[in-house]
């Protein structure tokens, strides 16, 4: 007898379009003999809308994350980041169907939902691993907080009226100090997110690197930096100067930073796994997602 298959469905069930998509996906999974799994809250929302889907089970209470085969994510990049948090450290890849705006991490659009689910059921996808960050906060010699991020760990000022006074470091060595609104430390995946909005470079996801991008720095040397993926980056809030800060990991997990706190970011050994239906050059994804103008391109001339 074949083992029971479990697929997690992550949807923003507070939105009508996302809830409807979640209902559609659950029906398609059940028709294929696969058990849909949802978080407790999203399962309640789903059953309130469609009581006949009572065979849908709850994540954790009935099915542990380690038993999941796949995660189907219905929404934009924020929903994908939430899904990555739910299954952190588990082998199940994330298959994103964009219901948001840019949806840079998503693999398909709403019109292709049924086809995307069918390919997920058939295991007709490739798995791409994306690097993540580990973030550690130290006050003196004490580690007071630890977290992780797929996109970025950002140190921001806690008070709009006070700038942050920081020292930035690479590989345990001081590089510069300045006043700023914050500092973004990013993965290549995050280079098209907050880092990009702050003026950082786009880094191809296959590049092993970390990025550091100052936010509105009052300094002559405040350029974005790209360092080796095995380097460490750190931001230290100067004692007795500037305001207090907040560490945000992927814009989801926050920790208040007192003056003197030091945030150290390194490459995490735990990647996020993405299910890819359309493998191809990252350039094509960049052009498609950002609707970049390429009119007039005549193709390689044979001399490349």
UniProtKB/Swiss-Prot annotation:
NAD(+) binds at residues 77-78, 82, 151-152, 162, 181, 192-197. It comes from the Bacteria. It is found in: Cytoplasm. Gene3D superfamilies: Probable inorganic polyphosphate/atp-NAD kinase, domain 1, Probable inorganic polyphosphate/atp-NAD kinase, domain 2. GO terms for cellular component: cytoplasm. Keywords: ATP-binding, Cytoplasm, Kinase, NAD, NADP, Nucleotide-binding, Transferase. Its EC number is 2.7.1.23. Its cofactor is a divalent metal cation. One of its GO terms (molecular function) is NAD+ kinase activity. Belongs to the NAD kinase family. This is NAD kinase.
């Amino acid at each position: 007898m074949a083992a029971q298959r479990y697929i997690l469905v992550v949807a923003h069930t507070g939105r009508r379009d996302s809830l409807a998509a979640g209902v559609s996906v659950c029906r398609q999974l059940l028709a294929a003999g696969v058990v849909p799994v949802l978080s407790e809250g999203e399962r309640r929302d789903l059953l309130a809308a469609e009581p006949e889907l009572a065979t849908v089970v709850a994540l954790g209470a009935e099915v542990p994350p380690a038993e999941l085969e796949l995660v189907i994510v219905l929404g934009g990049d924020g929903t994908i980041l939430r899904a990555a948090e739910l299954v952190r450290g588990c082998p199940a890849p994330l298959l994103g169907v964009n219901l948001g705006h840019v949806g840079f991490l998503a693999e398909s659009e709403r019109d292709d939902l049924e086809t995307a689910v069918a390919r997920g059921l058939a295991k007709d996808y490739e798995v791409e691993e994306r690097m993540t960050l580990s973030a550690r906060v130290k006050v003196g010699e004490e580690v007071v907080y630890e977290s992780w991020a797929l996109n970025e760990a950002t140190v921001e000022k806690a008070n709009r009226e006070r700038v942050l006074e920081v020292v930035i470091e690479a590989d345990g060595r001081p590089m510069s100090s300045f006043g700023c609104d914050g500092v973004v430390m990013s993965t290549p995946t995050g280079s098209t997110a907050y880092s990009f909005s702050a003026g950082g470079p786009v880094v191809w996801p296959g590049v092993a690197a970390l990025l550091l991008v100052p936010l509105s720095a009052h300094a002559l040397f405040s350029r974005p930096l790209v360092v080796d993926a095995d380097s460490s980056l750190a931001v230290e809030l100067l004692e007795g100067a500037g305001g207090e800060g907040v560490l945000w990991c992927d814009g989801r997990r926050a920790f208040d930073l007192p003056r003197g706190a030091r945030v150290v970011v390194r490459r995490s050994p735990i990647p996020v796994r993405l299910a890819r239906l359309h493998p191809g050059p990252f350039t094509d994804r960049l052009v498609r997602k950002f609707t970049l103008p390429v009119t007039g391109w005549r193709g390689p001339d044979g001399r490349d």
